[in-house]
């Protein structure tokens, strides 16, 4: 699933609930300092990804337009969090787009194998 991905890759992480422990037999494919399970394989054709690489230039602002989401980020990261988060996403946008395309191609390949 992550064939062709760099060893370390950025993602947008904005979730209140996350998988922290995998069931027996599942394989942890990616982790980060903030989330011990970023991607996992649960069965030969069942995967999960928690970090977002499928973002577009407006994604952070769109999510921030939802009051509960904005409040959550502000309470965790402080004033100006949206601007910092949006700027960080913008810096990585080209890589996000390349990784999203790679992930799509990988999903198509493993779905038919």
Residue ranges and their predicted role:
Residues 58-113:
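Acyltransferase
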Residues 1-58:
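Pocket-forming structural segment of enzyme catalytic cores
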